[in-house]
């Protein structure tokens, strides 16, 4: 056991010496790494004569992977600091002048909160960002030297930790040697990947980064339109520089961490390069005091600079709302809410009007305008803009309340006479809210959508109103294509007499336009009136109001028509209507005669053969006696009665012939 411990100590000291030696032992270290790689590969390929893997090789392989990670991390940090040092001299002359007021305004919030940007982006590992002064880009200590010191201390701590791990590893080594030899292919492959690709990737990304920055810095001055845009760019870059140094301090969690940090840096440059910058020449004056202009007690600038800050020309604080990537902006806005309210109420009305009409005669408008002279159109515009501001997405409730109070104070400053910070008059406040909620005038499209027929009628009757009666070529009947309800609505208008010729015109149009239009044969005048219900409204119209004519809706019911209607569905309607009435009359007469003939024939037969036509009922003796008496009383038929019966029989035969004749014609 003691030789193993001594061997572990020896290996750890050798590894520490090799890693701590500078450039002189580099070749020896590379030879050791190559020898260890050969051993690992031969064991992985399970060669028979492969030498066993020594613990020194294991320590070298383990240390080599960490060295590659440290090298990539150091290269990444060096590229960041080099780019920053290259960028700082070009921007210092522009950032120092406009950022003075902003630093003074944000000093209290930064003292209370600490550096929020570095904490958020660095994920809590912001030792360098917290200890570094935020004033200018150049600090008293050299950041490269400080970074080198921190890296050296981290490396020494890592070596001590590795020595302890080496001792424990030597103790466990003998029991786990067989299982570990199978899995040693992965460290060998990662070592080769790091040696072959790591340095090339870092060098290549560094070159791309520097060339991209050179192209950006060369094309930047040509793209800037004015001093205002360059100041905006400098303000953005200083904000990103404050947040950037906190990122390299966080230790990498995996092997992709250095590459991800390099990609983040390149993405930041691309975002700064291609980010759209809106509102170059102007900004909204009612939002400018809230966005970034410091209060009057903190800014020591003359009146011209205050006007520029209202217009949004040189205040870098206005970039908070434009670039939502700076997260601490909403917190700072919430802290400065009271200062914003005080500064917005003190603002003079002339400055605001001049800012609104800055590019087109602002001074003349300010001179010509007097307090209390604002037109209703401007009031409406102010109310609509304040409502839109309050409804805008992406803002906190505090900022919306600030904007609402600010809009009220602006309104009082414009319309309220000499004292702009006076307490609000209730009459003025009522007038302001009435103007803000005044209904917007209806556009022509909405009006035409709601009143299309009235618009058409006005257009068609324009000539009659001007005195032209019956202009040639005009469409005289546009209402014929409208519904009956529109007729009624039109007739209730004064000066519109009822035209009686519209009914046939409408019918003719219906017959022409509808290919399936078949007028029914039983249509009467009542049904014609029913088709034009709206016209009947007009016929029954009195001075007191509209009275309905019940004939319009309830025509006279014809019972005969339902009796005449045939039961067969496939008959020809026109032929049946012409010939049905005489046949029915004849059939009724025939039925009556047939009934009479049948009765007489029955009486005659019953008289001749009384026993045959007997009902067959079993009569009681009393009833039988009565029937016999009746027969005796009746006696035999007289000659006159017999003649009548013969005549009736002849008539019956004739009627039967006539009926057969009619039925034959009907079948044929």
Swiss-Prot record:
Protein family membership: Belongs to the chromogranin/secretogranin protein family.
Keywords tagged on the record: Cleavage on pair of basic residues, Disulfide bond, Glycoprotein, Phosphoprotein, Proteoglycan, Secreted, Signal, Sulfation
Phosphothreonine: residues bearing it: 79, 92
Bias (Low complexity) ranges: 237-255
Oligomeric form and interacting partners: Interacts with ITPR1 in the secretory granules.
GO CC, any one term: extracellular space
Full protein name: Secretogranin-1
Sulfotyrosine: modified positions: 557, 613
Annotated Acidic residues bias: 256-267
Segments of skewed composition (Basic and acidic residues): 64-90, 122-131, 144-159, 167-186, 204-215, 362-397, 435-450, 615-632
Biased composition (Basic residues): 272-282
Bias kind Polar residues: ranges: 188-200
Amino-acid biosynthesis keyword on record: no
Post-translational modifications reported in the UniProt record: Peptide SR-17 exists in both monophosphorylated and diphosphorylated forms.
Glycosylation site list: 93, 234
């Amino acid at each position: 056991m003691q030789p193993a411990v001594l061997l572990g100590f020896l290996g750890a000291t050798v590894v520490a010496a090799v890693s701590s030696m500078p450039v002189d032992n580099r070749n020896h270290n590379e030879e050791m790494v190559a020898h260890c790689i050969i051993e690992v590969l031969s064991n992985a390929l399970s060669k028979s004569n492969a030498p066993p893997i020594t613990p020194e090789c294991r320590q070298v392989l383990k240390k080599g992977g960490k060295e590659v990670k440290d090298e990539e991390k150091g290269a990444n940090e060096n590229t960041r600091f080099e780019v920053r040092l290259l960028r700082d001299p070009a921007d210092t002359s522009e950032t120092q002048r406009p950022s003075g007021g902003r630093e003074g305004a944000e000093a209290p919030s930064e003292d209370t909160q600490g550096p929020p940007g570095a904490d958020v982006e660095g994920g809590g590992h912001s030792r360098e960002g917290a200890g570094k002064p935020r004033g200018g880009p150049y600090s008293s200590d050299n950041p490269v030297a400080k970074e080198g010191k921190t890296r050296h201390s981290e490396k020494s701590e890592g070596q001590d930790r590795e020595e302890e791990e080496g001792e424990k590893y030597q103790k466990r080594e003998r029991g786990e040697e067989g299982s570990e030899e199978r899995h040693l292919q992965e460290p060998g492959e990662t070592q080769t990947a790091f040696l072959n690709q790591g340095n090339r990737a870092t060098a290549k990304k560094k070159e791309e980064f520097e060339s991209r920055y050179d192209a950006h810095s060369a094309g930047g001055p040509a793209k800037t339109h004015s001093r205002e845009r360059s100041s905006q760019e400098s303000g953005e870059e200083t904000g990103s520089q404050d947040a950037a140094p906190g990122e390299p301090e966080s230790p990498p969690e995996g092997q992709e961490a250095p590459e991800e940090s390099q990609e983040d840096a390149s993405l930041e440059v691309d975002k700064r390069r291609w980010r759209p910058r809106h509102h170059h020449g102007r900004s909204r004056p009612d939002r400018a005091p809230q966005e970034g202009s410091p209060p009057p007690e903190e800014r020591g600038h003359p009146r011209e600079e205050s006007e520029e800050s209202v217009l949004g020309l040189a205040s870098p604080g206005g970039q908070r709302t434009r670039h939502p990537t700076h997260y601490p902006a909403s917190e700072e806005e919430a802290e400065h809410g009271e200062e914003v309210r005080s500064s917005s109420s003190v603002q003079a009305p002339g400055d605001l009007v001049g800012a609104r009409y800055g590019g087109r005669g602002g001074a003349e408008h300010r001179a010509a305008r007097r307090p209390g002279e604002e037109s209703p159109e401007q009031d409406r515009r102010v109310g609509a803009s304040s409502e839109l501001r309050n409804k805008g997405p992406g803002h906190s409730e505090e900022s919306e309340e600030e904007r609402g109070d600010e809009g009220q104070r602006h309104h009082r400053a414009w319309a309220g006479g000499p004292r702009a910070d006076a307490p609000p008059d209730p009459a003025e406040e009522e007038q302001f809210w009435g103007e803000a909620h005044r209904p917007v005038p209806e556009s022509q499209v909405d009006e035409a959508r709601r009143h299309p027929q009235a618009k058409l009628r006005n257009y068609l009757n324009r000539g009659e109103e001007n005195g032209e009666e019956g202009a040639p070529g005009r469409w005289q009947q546009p209402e014929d294509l409208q519904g009956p309800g529109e007729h009624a609505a039109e007739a209730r208008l004064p000066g519109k007499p009822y035209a009686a010729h519209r009914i046939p015109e409408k019918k003719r149009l219906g017959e022409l336009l509808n290919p399936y239009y078949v007028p029914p044969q039983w249509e009467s005048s009542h049904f014609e009136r029913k088709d034009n219900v709206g016209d009947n409204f007009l016929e029954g119209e009195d001075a007191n109001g509209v009275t309905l004519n019940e004939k319009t809706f309830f025509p006279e019911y014809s019972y005969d028509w339902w009796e005449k209607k045939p039961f067969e569905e496939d008959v020809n309607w026109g032929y049946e209507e012409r010939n049905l009435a005489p046949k029915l009359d004849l059939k009724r007469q025939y039925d009556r005669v047939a009934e009479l003939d049948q009765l007489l024939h029955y009486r005659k037969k019953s008289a001749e053969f009384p026993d045959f036509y007997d009902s067959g009922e079993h009569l009681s003796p009393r009833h039988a006696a009565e029937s016999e008496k009746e027969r005796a009383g009746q006696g035999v038929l007289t000659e006159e009665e017999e003649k009548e019966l013969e005549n009736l029989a002849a008539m019956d035969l004739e009627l039967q012939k006539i009926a057969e004749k009619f039925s034959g014609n009907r079948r044929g």
